[in-house]
Amino acid sequence: TDIEVTEVLATDLLDAFERTPRLATVVLWAASRDEAMVVEHLVDVGRRAATERTAHFLLELGARLALVGMGSKVGYACPLSQYLLADALGLSAVHVNRVLRQLREAGMVTFRDGFVAFDDYDRLTDFAEFDPTYMDQMTPLLK
């Protein structure tokens, strides 16, 4: 995709915010959404056990893909290997394999042949304490 990039001076941006307060609101709202995602990822690494962290990550990927019409509460295509999942989660590939088996045997999610299937979406979201509102893209930025 072609894009065009330009440098914007901070003073020019602040002037634009002063002239158009609604623009400032939109930019700050978008930044707060990004910050909420970063905070959620820090909680993942610092406070969640490997099983909950993996479940949360798979749910978040699904929610992000749903925003662009590529995922649902049924599941989604996921070409990531267990090695890539391990890197993203800060776990070993062997540990990810064990965790995925535990989640599958518990009847919550199956990760097989490049597809994540949510076998019991509601139970999985409860287990992972997943609340997708931190990624909310449906609420209008301006009313």
Q: What are these model-derived regions, one by one?
A:
Residues T1-T11:
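Ligand-binding loop in jelly-roll beta-barrel domains
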Residues L9, F17-T20, A128:
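Short, flexible helix/strand-to-coil boundary loops that buttress conserved ligand/catalytic motifs
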Residues A10-T11, P21, R48, Y121:
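Alpha-helix N-cap/helix-start capping motif
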Residues L13-L14, L124:
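A generic structural signal for short hydrophobic patches within well-formed alpha-helices
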Residues E18-G90:
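Polybasic "coupling" helices that flank or enter modular domains
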Residues A63-K143:
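Phosphate-/nucleic-acid-contacting segments
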